[in-house]
Design a protein with these regions (language model features):
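Basic nucleic-acid-binding interfaces
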Residues: 1-86
Length: 86
């Protein structure tokens, strides 16, 4: 799974040729989530509220970077790292 960012132990990843709508995958320990890029809506999640809050804050700051990586992944192009939340 191509990792595009990591912060506070949270791993953000995207799959190549993944199904629409644009989204990214989150892993934190045994917790997982799928979050839409355009609306930041949860598609699937068992993240704790604290971790989810950090991820949504990060995604709101980097929505354009996420969409760019989504388009890259759809065309099998290398993904770009996204600045972590500090």
């Amino acid at each position: 799974v191509p990792e595009i960012s990591r912060f506070f132990g949270i791993i953000i990843a995207m799959f190549y040729n993944d199904h629409p709508p644009p989204h990214f995958h989150v892993r934190y320990g045994g917790q997982r989530a799928v979050i839409g890029i355009e609306d930041l809506a949860l598609k699937d999640s068992d993240l704790s509220p604290r971790v989810l809050g950090l991820v949504v804050e990060w995604a709101a700051l980097h929505r354009l970077d996420l969409l760019d990586n989504w388009n890259r992944a759809r065309t099998q192009s290398p993904l770009s790292p996204v600045q972590p939340l500090e």
